[in-house]
């Protein structure tokens, strides 16, 4: 039985709580409340009802027959988190945490967002429960994800552009934590990925593991077996932990697809496992992209949801233990995979999800036709249309 996190919030040497003293008590209160509610049947019933009646679960498992035939190898199945209310897996966690905040007596939430999907999910959950919502978002991401910014505002959230650093997810998270330090008495920090100080990586994983649980049962029903490989994109890593969790104790190969940007041998990438070293970011010990002096190197990816310089501590442990393999996918490879899926299956994936698709497509070609690859299609690509228009005008991503 998989034993992590341990009682002090560690995954081997990774994880923990590296935060100002001001936040130790709020974190302990959140951990205590979550432990109490985790096994509460009333809480579970309320959460499941929201997922089924409001978010639209269970999400579909789609056999990508035309792209599988085109590649000539393994069968490719897609776990369709893009079909969730708000368009991605992020709503699974947002609804869980807003319920937790409600049980703790909070009425205000703060959130960070990169691609805007978590911001939209948090704003949606806040609107549903009548909470005040403040979302921190890097100014670079505000520009490239303007549709999601407008969606958040329509949902009643305040969006705070962050101008420090590169104006991306890391910087938005920094500002969200600073704000929480000053307002932790009446605000709940609704974090969006399996990152940050304990208990957040654990909480987010628990609210996302329904992805893998559903997919496992659905695939057994359709194929009578488990997948040979499971592939998911990894920034912070919540959709990946959500789908991997159900297969950790199975004989299934697990692959995380990181953002290689312009290439891992250039300065323009967000490949934390490939190029990172041990350090502390946002309250957690993990791998991060840093220089010899411990200063964080600004990450880059065409995908706003993957350009994070760290990775969830559980992913760091799973890499070091060898249980999960992490591979890098460039911008061009992701865009090519996005185009192929769109043109063969009529499904427009998020650029984040396209990183997982690219790796799955590459592997499928060299596998027998009776083998199965399960891909976490973490979100839909509507939010990326402006980015895609700019990129494709330059002829990027024209082949797989």
UniProtKB/Swiss-Prot annotation:
This is Tryptophan synthase beta chain. The modification N6-(pyridoxal phosphate)lysine is found at residue 90. InterPro entries: Trp_synth_b_CS (IPR006653), Trp_synth_beta (IPR006654), Trp_synth_beta/beta-like (IPR023026), TrpB-like_PALP (IPR001926), TrpB-like_PALP_sf (IPR036052). GO terms for molecular function: tryptophan synthase activity. Keywords: Amino-acid biosynthesis, Aromatic amino acid biosynthesis, Lyase, Pyridoxal phosphate, Tryptophan biosynthesis. Its cofactor is pyridoxal 5'-phosphate. Belongs to the TrpB family. Tetramer of two alpha and two beta chains. It is an enzyme of class 4 (lyase). Disulfide bonds: none annotated. GO terms for cellular component: cytoplasm. It comes from Bacillus velezensis (strain DSM 23117 / BGSC 10A6 / LMG 26770 / FZB42). The beta subunit is responsible for the synthesis of L-tryptophan from indole and L-serine.
């Amino acid at each position: 039985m998989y034993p992590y996190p341990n009682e002090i919030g560690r995954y081997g040497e990774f994880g923990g709580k590296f935060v100002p003293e001001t936040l130790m008590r709020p974190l302990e209160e959140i951990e205590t409340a979550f432990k109490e509610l985790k096994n509460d049947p009333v809480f579970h019933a309320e959460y499941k009802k929201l997922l089924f009646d409001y978010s639209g679960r269970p999400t579909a498992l789609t056999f990508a027959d035309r792209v599988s035939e085109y590649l000539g190898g393994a069968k490719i199945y897609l776990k369709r988190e893009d079909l969730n209310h708000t368009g991605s897996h992020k709503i699974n966690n947002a609804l869980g945490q807003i319920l937790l905040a409600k049980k703790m007596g909070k009425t205000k939430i703060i959130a960070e967002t990169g691609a805007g999907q978590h911001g939209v999910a948090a704003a949606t959950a806040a609107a549903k429960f009548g909470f005040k919502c403040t979302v921190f978002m890097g100014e670079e991401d505000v520009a490239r994800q303007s549709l999601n910014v407008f969606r958040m505002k329509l949902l009643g959230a305040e969006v705070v552009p962050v101008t420090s650093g590169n104006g991306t997810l890391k910087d938005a998270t920094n500002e969200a934590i600073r704000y929480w330090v000053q307002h932790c008495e009446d605000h709940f920090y609704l974090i969006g990925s399996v990152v940050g100080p304990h208990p957040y990586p654990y909480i987010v994983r628990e609210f996302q593991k329904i992805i893998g649980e559903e997919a496992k049962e659905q695939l057994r029903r359709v194929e009578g077996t488990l997948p040979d490989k499971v592939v998911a994109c990894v920034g912070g890593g919540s959709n990946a932990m959500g789908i991997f969790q159900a297969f950790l104790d199975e004989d299934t190969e697990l692959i995380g697809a990181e953002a290689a940007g312009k290439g891992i041998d250039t300065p323009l990438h967000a490949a934390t496992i490939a190029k990172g070293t041990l350090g502390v970011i946002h309250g957690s010990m993990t791998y991060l992209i840093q220089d010899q002096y411990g200063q964080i190197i600004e990450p880059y990816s065409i995908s706003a949801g993957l350009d994070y310089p760290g990775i969830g501590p559980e992913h760091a442990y799973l890499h070091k233990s060898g249980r999960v393999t992490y591979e890098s996918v460039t911008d061009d490879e992701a865009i090519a995979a996005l185009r192929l899926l769109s043109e063969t299956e009529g499904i427009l994936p998020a650029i984040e999800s396209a990183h997982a698709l690219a790796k799955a497509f590459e592997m499928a070609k060299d596998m027998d036709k009776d083998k199965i690859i399960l891909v976490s299609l973490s979100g839909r690509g509507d939010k990326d249309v402006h980015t895609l228009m700019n990129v494709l005008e330059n002829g990027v991503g024209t082949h797989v």
